[in-house]
Structures are given as structure tokens and as C-alpha cells.
């Protein structure tokens, strides 16, 4: 009789333990995007920072491009420590750019500063939208990937910031699809570096950027559906040819877009 009671309580404990255990989707690699699943109502901290948890227990976070130390996830009072796998990034050389777009003249500094603030504001939005946990799709059909995340860019022989996006080369005018459901939080036709640019909010601090477009078909506040045509491929801003440069952000953390397409 005692053994049956013991077995009963052991089963109950294991069931509860499974419910409380955090599950992760994604790889703990530099630059990657992670989706977590916990019990509804649980409190989650990422490196002591509280993150939003959806009503059904989902949350999201990102791992920085050059992060070298472990990441600490706290579920209620339980700590989970994950080691981060390092990556080796490529070197990419791009020649033939107009000199003013490699090293912009001083008269453009104020404009660039204002545009960076505009983009930064859109990236810091923390909404309750649930789309961050859904599958993302490739935005351009039959494209060639010509630039990857993390590559060190040497522009006209001058070392510059790493590339934080994923480039899809296609003909000017090729349709661009929304990678996921979301709300348009930025729609600008002529930013200095990125040209015609869109930002979509997918919820919980997760946003995607579309850059160097030719035409934009949506406006700020529009609700877009996954697969909807939102514009066309172009070469606006600082670009040497027609392509779409996509970015993935978790708030201010710039992540590898391939990590959401892989998920």
C-alpha cells in the first residue's frame, strides 16, 4: 500500500516538474534567436532582466553577436545556465560604392543621427502581439543570398561595422513578402543608409527590418499577414545592386535572420 502511495506522489511530482520545466526552441549560438515555453503566469528573467511572458507561456530573447559568457535564465526562483557556442564570421569586401556613402560628409551627420533615432524607437516597442513565436518565411522567391550576418565589411578598402543582416539578391521590382504577421511601425522611402525601409513589430520586442527597397506598399499602423506583398526589391540607400537586406532584432540586440528562418 505504501509503495502505491509513494508511486502516486512520484508520478504527480514528475508531471508537475515537466509542466514547470522551461523548453527552448533555437540554438544557444552567438547571434541566435530563442523562443521559450514555460508555465502560464511564470516569471522569467534573462540575465536578471524581466521579459514578457504571453498568456500561454511563451517568451523570446536573443543572444548577442559577440557574446562570450553563459546566459542565465531564471524561471521563478530556478536558475538555468546555458553555455553559448562561438561562431567564426566571414569577411566581405564591397567595392564601387560612392565615397559619400562609405564615409558620409559632415552635412549628412544630423540626418543620419535623426534616422538612427527613428529606427531605434521602432526597435524598442514591446507589444503583446503573439506572432514572435510563429514560423517565419523567406521574403523573396528564387533569390541568391549574397550577404550574411556577422560578416566584417570592407567598403572600398575601408574596414566598417559588421553586417547585421541577410541579403537576398533579385531583380528590381521583384515582390517582397511579409515574413510573418505583424504591424508596420516604420515606413520610410529615403533613409540615408537603408533607403526605402520597413519595420514590422511581431510582439515581445521582436521586430524585422526590410531595407533598400524599390517600392513600399504599406504604411505605419497597417496589420500585415504572413505572405502579403509589402513592396518590391530595389537598390535604394547605400547599395551596389538590387537586393533585400533583412534584419532581426530583439529590442536593441541585432540577431541573425537565418536563425528565425531555420526555426
Regions found by a protein language model. Give the residues of each.
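Sec-dependent signal peptide recognition
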Residues: 2-12, 18
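Extended, charge-rich intrinsically disordered regulatory tails
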Residues: 222-224, 228-240, 246-263
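Zn2+-dependent peptidoglycan hydrolase active-site motif and core
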Residues: 179-214, 242, 247-248
Amino acid at each position: 500500500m505504501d509503495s502505491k502511495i509513494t508511486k502516486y506522489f512520484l508520478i504527480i511530482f514528475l508531471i508537475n516538474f515537466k509542466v514547470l520545466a522551461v523548453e527552448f526552441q533555437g540554438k544557444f549560438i552567438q547571434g541566435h534567436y530563442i523562443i521559450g515555453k514555460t508555465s502560464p503566469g511564470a516569471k522569467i528573467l534573462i540575465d536578471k532582466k524581466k521579459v514578457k511572458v504571453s498568456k500561454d507561456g511563451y517568451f523570446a530573447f536573443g543572444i548577442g553577436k559577440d557574446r562570450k559568457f553563459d546566459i542565465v535564465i531564471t524561471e521563478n526562483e530556478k536558475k538555468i545556465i546555458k553555455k553559448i557556442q562561438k561562431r567564426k564570421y566571414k569577411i566581405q569586401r564591397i567595392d564601387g560604392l560612392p565615397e559619400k556613402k562609405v564615409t558620409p560628409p559632415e552635412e549628412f551627420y544630423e540626418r543620419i543621427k535623426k534616422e538612427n533615432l527613428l529606427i531605434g524607437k521602432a526597435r524598442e516597442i514591446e507589444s503583446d502581439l503573439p506572432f514572435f513565436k510563429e514560423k517565419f518565411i523567406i521574403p523573396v522567391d528564387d533569390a541568391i543570398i549574397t550577404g550574411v550576418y556577422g560578416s566584417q565589411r570592407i567598403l572600398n578598402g575601408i574596414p566598417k561595422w559588421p553586417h547585421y543582416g541577410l541579403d537576398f539578391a533579385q531583380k528590381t521590382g521583384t515582390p517582397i513578402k511579409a515574413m510573418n504577421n505583424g504591424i508596420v511601425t516604420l515606413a520610410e522611402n529615403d533613409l540615408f543608409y537603408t533607403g526605402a525601409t520597413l519595420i514590422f513589430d511581431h510582439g515581445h520586442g521582436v521586430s524585422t527590418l526590410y531595407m533598400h527597397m524599390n517600392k513600399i506598399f504599406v504604411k505605419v499602423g497597417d496589420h500585415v499577414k504572413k505572405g502579403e506583398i509589402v513592396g518590391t526589391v530595389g537598390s535604394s540607400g547605400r547599395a551596389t545592386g538590387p537586393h533585400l537586406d533583412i534584419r532581426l532584432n530583439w529590442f536593441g540586440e541585432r540577431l541573425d535572420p537565418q536563425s528565425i528562418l531555420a526555426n
